[in-house]
């Protein structure tokens, strides 16, 4: 990535930057040097959080504006070509300053003849990818999310992973706030790739196990039902639905810890089932051939950047955000709440309210 990102610098260097005073010419290469160091840091496992932030900040504020300038420079004088590049930088600045706080609620209806009559009109709140370690310590955004979730008065809340970035202790400042989340039939959760706290190269087996234990205990303190390749049946009288949860079902380079057959063990042939899984790749890979009506996932963040229907998430995911259907099955991929760094533009932070409706067979 860093090699490609250097191309605009090389082009502009030969276009005229090489003639600048020495001090300015040296400053010109500073963003590219930071980008190169950040990519090396990520590849080597050093300073993961800092490297991610430097990498994406330099791409957004250095590489992309330079590309825009070069494109417009072919069509107009350089001082006019500078305007769209500066406008792009201002747009990205909004994403860093305000965009990550612009919470939205998306509403979806899922209809199924398999839904028991009691659950007709039942409301689920799907939220995912908090990445608590990315928020400023004095941020009231987490409280805003909690209030918005509770205001929807859902019957059940479902969280599909990545509560933290790389350390279970990221939960600690927000523990009392998250305890305020409430739903009549409870809050169910699964773990995402970040929750295993494996990023970087400074981990010991003992340290990892301590992180896992801490995160598990934190979610227990929150009152969340963690489904680790397991299921839970929610019953009201004779009516029931099954909530299935798997550990991270990642594709390389992410680990695959999911065991869907184990999670479904003991379930009958019939029934209405909701699967919680972090990575939406799992839907095509293993869920299509199973009697699971509704699948909820996150992980993609919708690239944290969306312009119209374009997002970088499209390059990695066939199902990157919103609702997808195959026959009677439905997948909802939420773009999530946070990210590895506090930036959102177009792909605003979101939660999804899903209303279940019973239809006749």
List each model region and its residues:
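Soluble catalytic domains of enzymes that build or remodel membrane lipids, polysaccharides, and related
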Residues: 118-361
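Non-catalytic terminal accessory segments
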Residues: 1-103
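N-terminal signal-anchor transmembrane helix
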Residues: 48-55, 75-152
